[in-house]
Amino acid sequence: GLGDVYKRQWDRTYRTPGEPLDTVMPMAVLINGASASAAEIVSGSLQDMDRAVLIGQRSFGKGLVQSPRELPYNGSVKVTMSKYYIPSGRCIQQMDYSHRKADGSVGAIPDSLTSVFYTSKGRPVRDGGGITPDFKIEEPETPTMMFYLVTDFLLTDFVAEWSQKHKKIAPPEDFEVTDEDFEAFKQYAKEKNFTYDRQSEKLLKNLKEVAKFEGYMDNDSTIFNSLEAKLTPDLDRDFDRNKDQIKKLLTSEIMKRYYFQKGELINSLKEDDVLDKALEVLGDPALYQQTLEAPGKVEKTATL
């Protein structure tokens, strides 16, 4: 039909200049929420063809193609022209721009409206939400306090002073922040009168207002007072509670100052749950093959 003719006009076939170097070597691809567009197409295609295992967190979900168009008075606009589809037939787009809410905002495609597709060996995969890894490694929650440590430049300023007392440090693969360094940073935060908001404290304030409006405050005020005491920021307590994450932030800042981005990356690989899982899977041929096998018979699989 006419539609097929139109589609063929836009078909493009690209070929590599030579034969592939290796078609059987086990591969693991690390992805997370920052993996978008081309990264998702490559990782998703490898998953669809059962050529690699994917490890990490769900990818971003950018499956639309935009083309810029010139406008008068040196203006320009990007127009969505097409969508990305990968070998199984699924689209990786997460945000549904075809259906807008009353206020004009858009939301992600709910899981209930996604469809099942199949890899070349028959493994079920879904569309509409980026690429879901074969092994999910959840990232730890980041407390609000961490955000303020970075945005208030407290880390940067402390490391600038710290570096004046430490002209040389261990190489990236060996360096570790000591407990003494951690305590020094905590003391520095106190001296600089470091303050931070906590979402739990704000939510409690809203809850108290609702309880007062509904008449519960008079009978249960002691409960709210107890909660308020527990949720009031306490620098010593919160520093100690988040010690491991704060030490990681310190380490990252120190590495960037002494060894730049390369050193920071080398050091971070010492404690990387996603990388550790990749090494585990690649080191276990049985687990690797089992991951790529289909759970049962299916009707249609991915093809190139």
Model-derived features: positions:
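Generic structural motif
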Residues: 34, 84, 138-140
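Short, small-residue-biased leader/transition segments that mark boundaries at the very start
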Residues: 2-6
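Signal peptide-directed extracytoplasmic domains
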Residues: 7-12
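Active-site loop and adjoining helix of the penicillin-binding protein/serine DD-peptidase-beta-lactamase fold
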Residues: 19-37
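Polar, glycine-rich mid-to-C-terminal structural blocks
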Residues: 38, 50, 55-57, 61-123, ...
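Extracytoplasmic/secreted envelope proteins and their assembly/folding machinery
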Residues: 24-27, 39-43, 47, 52, ...
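Mature extracellular/periplasmic domains of secretome proteins
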Residues: 14-21, 44, 69-70
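Conserved functional hotspot residues or short segments at active or partner-binding sites
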Residues: 91-92, 96-304
